[in-house]
Regions:
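Predominantly a Rossmann-like dinucleotide-binding segment in NAD(P)-dependent oxidoreductases
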Residues: 117, 124-207, 323
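C-terminal helix-rich "cap/oligomerization" subdomain common to oxidoreductases
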Residues: 1-4, 67-70, 113, 291-346
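Beta-loop-alpha module in the N-terminal Rossmann-like domain of NAD(P)-dependent dehydrogenases
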Residues: 19, 51-110
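Contiguous beta-strand/loop segments that form the cofactor/metal-binding neighborhood of enzyme cores
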Residues: 183-257, 283-297, 316, 331-346
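Short, Asp-centered acidic motifs that coordinate Mg2+ and/or phosphate
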Residues: 33, 67, 147
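Active-site loop of classical SDR/Rossmann-like NAD(P)-dependent oxidoreductases
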Residues: 275-286, 301
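N-terminal Rossmann-like dinucleotide-binding module
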Residues: 1-49, 345
């Protein structure tokens, strides 16, 4: 491995370009090439970024590439990620990890077999107020946690693109935006074992995709979590509350707000306000990825984390169709978790 980690960026859309610029700006990484199924888009991106454009297959097979960032439509995640892992490349794949659990499972199994690292891109873990919440919970600031509830969404701005194509995306608002908070719920509370939920197409003409869905999750120790994910959230973006025996945490990212509020049962409150800080979540997430690869540790969220978020979203879809609760944690998940831990140490 050279002094700098050498990257290929596959996918030159909005997120792909954002990731490519982050690679260029980092002192310990180099952008070797970009690729896209639209070759003209790749050429234009390469010109703007001062790098080389190649085909997807060449980017995967290049010997001078250590890591690959995949920012393509969900449908093409497995066909891009698995060959890259098979080549021994460390892979960063945008959330959601896949359209469905079966595809996500194939990707995680490929990572375990290859012993290369698979990371799910999920920058909300690196929001400063989310990081503060994690710190406060680790310090038992709330006492024993009782439940979590939250919502996430936007006004459906992305629906003029492939996001409204069921074959390309695999699911609607709950899989897309919801996977962010599903990941954070697991990060804060542990494994979800069962869920019940409902989905609906309330406003946008995108059926069979949903523009609103709500799920209730039961976690391994009996805690409950509620999530509403929406593409009709006009005052976007995210809000979450965590209640414990001794108090509560409110994580507020509505519009330009970025705060974490710690409240106690005696009525006292402490507000941590990050609203005036420049957004850094993408930079912090990428920096942690680089440090993890250098240290030989699994970057987080892992591929397994990404799989679990997809399973949780799929569980809500199945529950909405059947009218029954959906199990989320069984022997297959336990065996895969153990194999993933053995392969990655995470």
């Amino acid at each position: 491995m050279s002094d700098k980690l050498r990257f290929a960026a596959i996918g030159c859309g909005r997120m792909g370009l954002r990731r490519a610029k982050t690679i260029i700006d980092h002192p310990d990484t180099a952008l070797v090439c970009v690729a896209d199924s639209d070759h003209e888009k790749a050429k234009a991106a390469a010109k703007d970024l001062g790098t080389e454009s190649v085909g997807n297959e060449e980017a995967i097979n290049r010997k001078d590439v250590d890591c690959i960032v995949v920012s393509v439509p969900n449908k093409f995640h497995p066909s891009t990620v698995i060959p890259a892992l098979n080549q021994g490349k460390h892979v960063w794949c945008e959330k959601p990890l896949a359209r469905n659990p079966d595809e996500a499972l194939q990707m995680v199994e490929a990572a375990i077999k290859s012993k290369a690292f698979l990371k799910t891109g999920a920058n909300l873990r690196y929001f400063p107020n989310v990081q503060k919440a994690r710190q406060l919970l680790s310090q038992q600031a709330l006492g024993e946690v009782l439940f979590v509830r939250g919502w996430i969404g936007n006004a459906g701005w992305q629906l003029k693109s492939w996001f409204s194509d069921p074959d390309m995306i695999g699911g609607g608002a709950f899989l897309d935006n919801g996977s962010h908070l599903l990941d954070i719920y697991r990060w804060l509370l542990g494994e979800a074992v069962e869920c019940i939920g409902y989905s609906t197409t309330a406003y946008w003409p995108i059926s069979p995709l949903e523009d609103n869905a709500m799920g209730v999750f039961k976690f391994a120790d009996g805690k409950l979590g509620f999530l509403h994910s929406s593409w009709t959230e006009w005052a976007e973006y995210m809000y979450m509350e965590i209640y414990g025996k001794e108090g509560y945490l409110r994580i507020d990212n509505r519009q330009s707000t970025s705060t974490a509020t710690l409240g106690k049962r005696d009525g006292s409150r402490q507000v941590f306000d990050y609203s005036k800080e420049p957004p850094q979540s993408y930079t912090l997430e990428f920096d942690d990825f680089v440090k993890a690869i250098r240290a030989g540790r699994q970057p987080l969220p892992s591929g397994f984390d990404g799989l679990r978020a997809v399973q949780m979203a799929q569980g809500v879809y199945e529950s909405s169709r059947s009218g029954k609760s959906t199990p989320l944690w069984g022997d297959r998940e336990k065996m895969l978790f153990e194999a993933h831990q053995k392969a990655t140490g995470a």
